[in-house]
């Protein structure tokens, strides 16, 4: 964890020294008041209640507590939608953009592929530690092909779309890679799976993740007006964040049940 400190410090210094964004007119207080605090709080409560319900479902506590948390998640989500559609002047999730087919599909794709990717990143080391009995270094090393594939395929897919002028085939291929990569992990066996098979199956989910994020962002930018690029991109990042959170919070229950 300490290795991240100098990297984050270098990133902070670089942004502080090089990034120059013209400031808009108005005081700091006026800019802070523009933030959708109500929507943010409602979304936070909904996600926290959902995570609590999943955590209680894994424990031996009363089932009523699980249902109460789920009800709280539904209520929080309902309040969030109401605030975004009826109250917020600058909503966290602009519903008029999300109501269109392309932004909605892009947001859903980003959320689902993030769920899959972060589920893999969270549980693959846990599998090698708990099931295979490897060291922490070996368990973490198995993630290297996934991360490298995500970075490389993100760049390659962007170049491919730039040369061909079409993103449909690349999006379909990215989704196929993600599905095949996740399915190949289902055939891992403690004694029967050789080491080379782990290395061979690890990159594909990362490859699909990296290329999907890049290509869908291009598709989104081309489908909205220039003035809507920022809020539309914000919606996709919201779904990506929620997908990554659910990937790390929902999948542990399935993982624990499979080990049991």
Question: Predicted segments — roles?
Answer:
Residues 5-12, 77, 151, 179-180:
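Small-residue-rich packing faces within the transmembrane alpha-helices of Major Facilitator Superfamily
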Residues 10, 217-218, 222, 235-260:
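Hydrophobic transmembrane architecture of multi-pass small-molecule transporters
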Residues 44-66, 80-87:
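Phenylalanine-glycine-rich, low-complexity intrinsically disordered regions
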Residues 48, 155-159, 245, 249:
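Residue-level hotspots within transmembrane alpha-helices of multi-pass secondary transporters
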